[in-house]
Amino acid sequence: MKEPTIENFLAFEREHKCNQIEIEGMHVWALYRYEIHNAIKAETVGRTEGDAQGFTKSELIRMAINALKPFTYKNVDVLFIGNGRRTKNADTGIYEDIYCDEIAKKYNSVILEHPENHGHCTPNGMDNVYFTDRVAFQTNLAVKLLKKFNTKKRQQRTAAVTEKIGPILDAIKTEFGPDLREKLIPDIVDRMYYIDITKKYCGKILDKANPKLIIEICYYAMESYAMSMLGHERGIHTAEYSHGFAFPTHTPMQYNPEDHLTELPDDELI
C-alpha cells in the first residue's frame, strides 16, 4: 500500500484524471478532494487537517440572526472572500484578518466572511465586513432536509456520483487501503447541493457588488469555489492570495499544473 503523502495523492489524481470528472457542470472530485485526502489519512496515518463538525441548534439560530442583515455594498472595486480566521492583536485587543484587512482599507472594497469554527470573532470596526451566515444557514438546513426526504434529484445525483466516482474510490482502496465508498458518495452528493445554493447566493451578491476583481483568501471555501465559477461566467477576474503555500503538505494548496478548472481562480498571488 502507498502512503497518503501529497505526492502520492497528486500522482493518483493525475493517473485517474480525477479533477476532470464532471457532473452537471461541476468538477465534483475537485470540489471534495480536500475531504477525500483527509479521509484517506484518517484511515491510514490517523491524521487530518480541518475536519468539519456539525452545527448545533444554538449556532444555527445565531447564524439565522446574522443572516437578517442585508447586503448593501454596490459597485466595489475589490471583493475579498475572507476565511473568517481573525487573530487577536495583543496590543489593541482587536481581532484582525492579517491577510486582507489592511489592503482592503486602500480600496473601495467589501470582505465577505464566512463563519469560522461556527462563529465570528469581533472584526476590527471596519464597515466593509459582511458575514455570509445566510448561505451557511441555508446550506446546512437544505442538506439535512434533502437527506431526510431523499428526493428524486438526489437519487439521480447519487447514481451519477456512484457511476463516475465509485471506480475511483475502489482504486483508492487498492492503492491506499481504506474503503471509502459508503462514507464519501453521499458526502460528495451533499457537496453538489452546497455549491448549488452557494453559487445562487453569491450570484446575488455579485449583482449588487459588481466588482472589478475578486480576491480569495482560501479557494477551497464554498464561497470561493462559487465565486470562481461565477467569475469565469461573468468575465470577472479572480485571484487567490496563496498564503497556504507555507504548508506544502496541505492538500488544497496543491494541484497538478494541467488542472485548469472553472472552480479555481485565474491567478495565484504568492
Model regions and ranges:
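Catalytic-core helical/loop segments in enzymes performing group transfer/polymerization on anionic/lipid-linked
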Residues: M1-I270
